[in-house]
Amino acid sequence: MEPRDPSPEGRSSDSESASASSSGSERDAGPEPDKAPRRLTKRRFPGLRLFGHRKAITKSGLQHLAPPPPTPGAPCGESEEQIQSTVDWSESAVYGEHIWFETNVSGDFCYVGEQHCVAKMLPKSAPRKKCAACKIVVHTQCIKQLEKINFRCKPSFRESGSRNVREPTFVRHHWVHRRRQDGKCRHCGKGFQQKFTFHSKEIVAISCSWCKQAYHSKVSCFMMQQIEEPCSLGVHAAVVIPPTWILRARRPQNTLKASKKKKRASFKRRSSKKGPEEGRWRPFIIRPTPSPLMKPLLVFVNPKSGGNQGAKIIQSFLWYLNPRQVFDLSQGGPREALEMYRKVHNLRILACGGDGTVGWILSTLDQLRLKPPPPVAILPLGTGNDLARTLNWGGGYTDEPVSKILSHVEEGNVVQLDRWDLRAEPNPEAGPEERDDGATDRLPLDVFNNYFSLGFDAHVTLEFHESREANPEKFNSRFRNKMFYAGTAFSDFLMGSSKDLAKHIRVVCDGMDLTPKIQDLKPQCIVFLNIPRYCAGTMPWGHPGEHHDFEPQRHDDGYLEVIGFTMTSLAALQVGGHGERLTQCREVLLTTAKAIPVQVDGEPCKLSASRIRIALRNQATMVQKAKRRSTAPLHSDQQPVPEQLRIQVSRVSMHDYEALHYDKEQLKEASVPLGTVVVPGDSDLELCRAHIERLQREPDGAGAKSPMCHQLSSKWCFLDATTASRFYRIDRAQEHLNYVTEIAQDEIYILDPELLGASARPDLPTPTSPLPASPCSPTPGSMQGDTALPQGEELIEAAKRNDCCKLQELHRAGGDLMHRDQKSRTLLHHAVSTGSKEVVRYLLDHAPPEILDAVEENGETCLHQAAALGQRTICHYIVEAGASLMKTDLQGDTPRQRAEKAQDTELAAYLENRQHYQMIQREDQETAV
């Protein structure tokens, strides 16, 4: 690192540079050629410097391993020319390279510090980037400056070679300075008070980007010996692949000795047994150190799944894990990674995507024939996700912390999943008149994990896929897609295109001909089902406990369930019904006499007349999310679970949740009590839901007392308020996996997405009563000179003086709440400028809605003013009332941009979130029209 001026000024600027990475021996790196001898002496200092007055110590340089030699063909200067946004697996990969993503963070100062920041003099705020692996933020122009302060990212691999004779078997911390830090200091247990240092350039914490331990940036909390001590890799050490396992290999040289070896016949025989993938040279090799306590994890993310969820979730995994165990499936698929990690003992896989992504990974594992096959867990993205629902992972990802997901993967149970072969060949008995030019002789997949179906559902799916391929621009909205599905299903129903399905098929299951039974039933759809879930969570097999002819459905019993659907049973399926159970079998021979739409795990096609054989292929090893109690906080004086729990139920609106879910205390204050339920001490959330809904139906319950304010919608869900640093939603499909005692202690919180913000606050004046029920006593200030002013000016003065009682009195007397002054400012503008929350709430409830987007002479709405003044609560009120977040003032700024200029990043992030929500809502409304 470049030495600093020993003066106090020099130390101050050094604290701003904030380079706090721990390193290996810097002496191994050798002196830099442009350094003077005096500086070389200073570099041999044991690596400690004080930050200002009794600030924490730091050591510069690379991380826990000896600095690697420059990669041949990749000089140091060239590596910085290109900003890296993905993990580099080439032989020219840079040691300790950052992985940059775009960010809209504006409050955090540039990590390189003012001394090295080249963007500080620019007139406008320069674009910034954030490293996903160590979470530092720098200006794009300042990325090269990180070399000057010698700060690299946490290392993801180590170098191999004869120089590193004593290769390290442990990982050292990667210390990073933070100007903001959540949680508490590991040494003293006190918080970091980031609320008071938000606009400060002072370093408040030093944290490790591996284990996430954080300390106050002062010598009383962060000791010198902690720089060199081994890192535990944190609470997820069992799933993190240490960088010591990953070696960069040297490309073999064409020496004389090597050429002689190539001529040996035995060598030729050995190499001929290897496939082309296994035999070729790779820049990186894996040398694991097996441990029975470790469950190393590979994460595969499909960024195309779930809108933008996949791309965002990658960044979270890069932070919690080694970046070289996280893979983007759009960059080449899973095969390369599975080949490389095939010898890692006790390996587990996390597939982030839809059921199609899971099937892709399972098929690749089949091709590689890994022994034993690693179990696969699922993080469901998007919609549908029937396999994920079956294995208790839920129907989609909401906002569960990634840290908790990793714990679920580590602790999940290993189960088996039947996989079924599909073999189709043309039906030679079909006549030429049955041929269809648009049909194909091949199925889209030759194996299925979920289901194989033909008839009505396949026809609807096929039309959707064909229309989307022809006009992809018309299918970029989930709402539009659902509308198209509904329209196609309705038109297909009217046309009756699948009503004669039974006349053109023959079904033989385990040697028994079911064709007569099917012809009597006249189904419009037949499903061969492997798992209990189908069509986004429905259960078509149901619970045949009363029917002794059928067994309950399992995904590992080697049997398929054959189900027929009439239009009546298809409609009943969406409200808890089931289809017509035909049989359970191990083998199916299906013959079609004409071209019929079919689908394999959601992939449709129109299959020409064929003979199809379905038989068990193998069993895949999967991870099933377990029901556990270990997430509950443990205390030394913890009491056993009582027989009964008496719990207060409180409801949170979606507006409050999105604005405050990172602030537990404020969100608790914003919640509305619904009542009290008494549940068994060991009850899960599924049972608790039944008690809460019973509370709504009781004559003396909360729903009966105030139906407008307290009646729950059908889409409410539980909130976990205990196991993470913030609130997060619990998927309804996973309620049976969580105990009440895990997510609540004395009070349980639920989120109602259809609850309006105003109804969540009973202390606000209700819109249904235009005037207050009880008169107010005028304040002394309101009594002076009131009669001397016109009514409009009286209203303005009342708004300025925060005199809500006077405002109500004038309104009752016929005052116009839309009155403006000479500069076109409304009463709401004046109330915002003085920070009068009570007046703002009254105006929002009683003034016409046009007041929300009314502009004054500078083009500013009341929301522009509130954002510029950093009035978060008032902004929250105005946004809840329905103000537009996309209106711009005369300078072209939206309210979010005004908050950014005021350097209030939390408010700007909230406004940006609500702005995106408004845009999506507007798009869906336009589509509905």
Curated annotation (Swiss-Prot):
It comes from the Eukaryota. Residues 15-24 have a biased composition (Low complexity). Residues 292-426 form the DAGKc domain. It is an enzyme of class 2 (transferase). Pfam families: Ank_2 (PF12796), DAGK_acc (PF00609), DAGK_cat (PF00781), DGKI (PF23578). Transmembrane segments: none annotated. Its EC number is 2.7.1.107, 2.7.1.93. GO terms for biological process: diacylglycerol metabolic process; lipid phosphorylation; maintenance of postsynaptic density structure; negative regulation of Ras protein signal transduction; negative regulation of T cell receptor signaling pathway; phosphatidic acid biosynthetic process; phospholipase C-activating G protein-coupled receptor signaling pathway; Ras protein signal transduction. Residues 279-417 are annotated as: Mediates interaction with RASGRP1. A motif (Nuclear export signal) lies at residues 362-370. One of its GO terms (cellular component) is cytosol. Residues 1-46, 59-81, 257-281, 421-441, 760-785 are annotated as: Disordered. ANK repeats lie at residues 823-853, 858-887. Residues 764-778 have a biased composition (Pro residues). The modification Phosphoserine is found at S706, S782. It is found in: Nucleus; Cytoplasm, Cytosol; Cell membrane; Cell projection, Lamellipodium. A motif (PDZ-binding) lies at residues 925-929. Residues 258-273 have a biased composition (Basic residues). It catalyses: a 1,2-diacyl-sn-glycerol + ATP = a 1,2-diacyl-sn-glycero-3-phosphate + ADP + H(+); a 1-O-alkyl-sn-glycerol + ATP = a 1-O-alkyl-sn-glycero-3-phosphate + ADP + H(+); 1-O-alkyl-2-acyl-sn-glycerol + ATP = 1-O-alkyl-2-acyl-sn-glycero-3-phosphate + ADP + H(+); 1,2-didecanoyl-sn-glycerol + ATP = 1,2-didecanoyl-sn-glycero-3-phosphate + ADP + H(+). Keywords: ANK repeat, ATP-binding, Cell membrane, Cell projection, Cytoplasm, Kinase, Lipid metabolism, Membrane, Metal-binding, Nucleotide-binding, Nucleus, Phosphoprotein, Repeat, Transferase, Zinc, Zinc-finger. Diacylglycerol kinase that converts diacylglycerol/DAG into phosphatidic acid/phosphatidate/PA and regulates the respective levels of these two bioactive lipids. Thereby, acts as a central switch between the signaling pathways activated by these second messengers with different cellular targets and opposite effects in numerous biological processes. Also plays an important role in the biosynthesis of complex lipids. Does not exhibit an acyl chain-dependent substrate specificity among diacylglycerol species. Belongs to the eukaryotic diacylglycerol kinase family. This is Diacylglycerol kinase zeta.
